[in-house]
Amino acid sequence: MLLWGLVTLAAILASEAFLRLPVLGRIAEVSATAQKAGRVLRSSRISDHWKERILPAYALRIGLGSATFFVLLCIALLPVLIAGLLYPPGLLAWSEELMRPLVILVLCAISLGYIWLRTRDATRPARSGASDYSALDRTLHRLALGSPMVGEMAMDIEKGLFLKSAPEDSGRHVFVTGLARAGTTILMREIHATGQFGSLTYADMPFVLAPNLWAKLSSKGAKVGTRAERAHGDGIEVDTQSPEALDEVYWRMADSSAYIGEEGLSPHAPDEEVVAGYRDLIRLVLRKTGKTRYVSKNNNNILRIGPLADAMPEAQFLVPLREPLAHAASLLNQHERFADSDPFVRDYMTWLGHHEFGATHRPFLFDGRPEGDPATLDYWLGTWIAAYRALDAAEAAHGNICFIPYEALSGDPAVWAAVARRIGLEPRPAGELKVVCDKAPGAHDAALAAEAAALHARLKARGLAKLGL
């Protein structure tokens, strides 16, 4: 009886220490530094002289991070040692008991049970946009998405097992991108609903970078599940088979330091190796879905749309264009909606690279950090102008980038038919597109609104022209 009491106490105290100490954070830091060092070492654009200067610094950071991780792990396991000191037969007998399969099983069961109880309150809905994940799901998400090392390992295993049998990359893919709330989700869903494209879906979570392996291990993809309105409160219902903006997980794992900073997200020019890794992920998704073309919606792709359009000339990049005042008002509404998200939701949004609004908001840094207060409409109007000014230049330089006027797409079937033809599909009636009635905008700077309206009119005309309308 004493043995099991000590086992229980050790499991609970060690689990609590593990939850409180930044153990996984140190793993992530070491992994990120190792990835940077590897890219520097492989880069042909960095001279040997600079490699010799920077690599020792990376080695020092990896060494210190590994040592810190080891110390934290030892601290977390101290309760197990203390329990051994309290065990009357002695520490050696205690270590022998810990090797017994039954004791190991009980230790694991108690630890997982305690973690579930400890985090159970976190599963209660927050006022805005909380998730309904169980404690076990949350732990799995933290492991798979919170640690770059785990993500990189998962993708390496996936590529080793499945890449050779994946279809060749035709390049005829479709990438939907733009500021959040522009209509990117609904456009991507209409394209996916044609049945001609493969995409990442909620069933691929949390091992987004290993879709084939996760499909074999998980039952999530075997059934559609219950449809429910997503956290945005915009009437769009999702289930496990719904396509979603998940491939930003790859960019964050492979090249986060190149564009994600404390102040915001900077324009991103991934090198050939990083783009090649992304194309490998596309092939793996196509293998899992049995398709030959890929569709994705990723709002962060506006940061890298020019380099991607150059790297994938056969692909089409569709940029929904929404009337700026209505668009800014929608962004402000979502910012307020997600401002009080619970800690897990904030982590979840960060793991997926979603910093568009809410508690995890980090602006796009096209013209520096946007001026003003995110609680005002003018801030989001300024954000709109900066983003679409950058997209204006990218679209003008690339024939495979096209603006899609959102209001026209929603209200005129001819626009959807033109979009379908542009991406090589036989036009068919849209299933979810519908006219959206925007509310009257709040107080705003009239000059700023006029500047945005002029830019919108110019881009709308160019978009319709490229669609042949």
Predicted features along the sequence, with ranges:
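PAPS-dependent sulfotransferases, especially Golgi type II membrane carbohydrate sulfotransferases
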Residues: 125-168, 332, 336-469
